[in-house]
Amino acid sequence: MTKRDLHNEGGDENKPRKKQKSEKQKKEKSAKSKSSAEQSLSYVQSPALGDVPQSEIEKFLTENSIKITDTSSENVMRPIISFSHLPPCKDDLYAPLSSFKSPTSIQSATWPLLFAGRDVIGIAETGSGKTLAFGLPCLKKIQDSAMTKQKPYRPLAVIISPTRELAMQIYDQLLKFSGSVGVRVACVFGGVRKEEQREALKTAGVVVATPGRLKDLQNDGSVDLGKVKYLVLDEADRMLDKGFEQDIKDIIRPMPVSKRQTIMFTATWPPSVRDLASTFMSSPVTVTIGGDPSADPRANTRIKQVVEVVKPHEKESRLVQLLNRSQRGVPEPEKVLAFCLYKKEAMRIERLLRTKGFKVAGIHGDLSQQERFRSLDAFKTGAATVLVATDVAARGLDIPSVKQVINVTFPLTVEDYVHRIGRTGRAGAEGHAVTLFTETDKAQSGALINVLRAAKQDIPEDLLKFGTTVKKKQHDAYGAFFKNVDTDKTATKIVFDD
């Protein structure tokens, strides 16, 4: 479906109709822009934030690598650098913030914009506090609008995430804040029965969902999205990678345009995500934390990266040696996340470590939803100190206090490598990542070397021997010959000579 079709289900049977639809879209976009401008007037900067010297604001933005791009306004809103700078709220919405020292970079930069009702694109690494960045303004918006009691099966806010685990994580975080404002939150995802989810949707003001299950519930009439005022697409790049673009378009189609605030969070900024943003968002403000998101992937500089070049048959014994060092003979065993490439490999490694006496749990595609939750819970509580995972756990999961990531097998792309090791070194902490690299991975050596150099990490001579050439990026289905094509562009007429 093209951008033109988003609010035009009737097709292009004739020219006048197409023109009429185009004019309607312009009116909708104009109404949306007007609505955003009016909403921005509702945010009043706190006097305490206004008293902060401009030099201190600029220093904060520079030190935290924050870039704010607003093409529709020359006046950039000041970041909320302290919880005391938050706008006034009813009840005890901010009470749970007492367990945090200060806002994260993404929260500081996006909160003023989101409280003002602007559409926002947030580009930041995982583990940066994105859930509260979009969650707090969402709950405050519902609270301020006195819409805590809405009609059955008609949520006011929808948050879409790529995985069940991430959806549950967002849900758990929102529950800590939603009770004080009387907003019910529902979480819907695949792999479990729909009956309980339908019951939860009846009274939910906020719905956290994976795209596949939400579309199913939407199609069978279990939820009406016609009153949604607040839409969040979390980890948009990951959802597109997983093939959810059409599902997302179908989900958004019935939502109002002029009164909807849309927020998109992503770790990368490829053309596919840019196209999605231009389709659903109106004059969004882009907030980037870190370097250029369209450039080569960069690892968190707080993570110490170690690459060991080994023979394939040496990987398992080396893994056991590394775990012996962090799990045995120490006052408190460290939490270690061990990544495998395929689920069969993960199952084999999990069995091996269990026979060696390690407290281990696993998370991969062959496990039921309940088994995956049990594994994650065991790892979070310390009942298991080693979690063996496939890349299903590589993005978005907030597992606190992970001291070390071990890549038993190198992933298919260096982007996945960066996301994997990003499970450690979160929330300002130091992290450690060990990668067991073999000759079968040599096609990725050049890209890996670039990541190591960018983070000023040591590069082993054995890795340099594989070469520094970076393999051309390929599309999953179309290989190296893939290129992005504007599907809205009129086709060129080709005439052949006789």
Swiss-Prot record:
What's in the keyword line of the UniProt record? ATP-binding, Helicase, Hydrolase, Nucleotide-binding, Nucleus, Ribosome biogenesis, RNA-binding, rRNA processing
One Pfam family, short name please? DEAD
- What spans are recorded as compositionally biased (Basic and acidic residues)? 1-15, 22-31
Q: What is its main location?
A: nucleus
Q: Where is the Helicase ATP-binding domain?
A: 111-287
The record's subcellular location field reads: Nucleus, Nucleolus
Chain positions covered by the region annotation Disordered: 1-47
Key word RNA-binding present: yes
Q: What Gene Ontology terms describe what this protein does at the molecular function level? A: ATP binding; ATP hydrolysis activity; RNA binding; RNA helicase activity
> One GO BP annotation here?
endonucleolytic cleavage in ITS1 upstream of 5.8S rRNA from tricistronic rRNA transcript (SSU-rRNA, 5.8S rRNA, LSU-rRNA)
For this record, an example GO cellular component is: nucleolus
Short sequence motif Q motif: positions? 99-107
Q: Does the keyword Transcription apply?
A: no
EC number in record: 3.6.4.13
Q: What does this protein do?
A: ATP-dependent RNA helicase required for 60S ribosomal subunit synthesis. Involved in efficient pre-rRNA processing, predominantly at site A3, which is necessary for the normal formation of 25S and 5.8S rRNAs.
Domain comment in the entry: The Q motif is unique to and characteristic of the DEAD box family of RNA helicases and controls ATP binding and hydrolysis.
Q: Could you tell me what this protein is called?
A: ATP-dependent RNA helicase dbp3
Q: Which gene encodes it?
A: dbp3
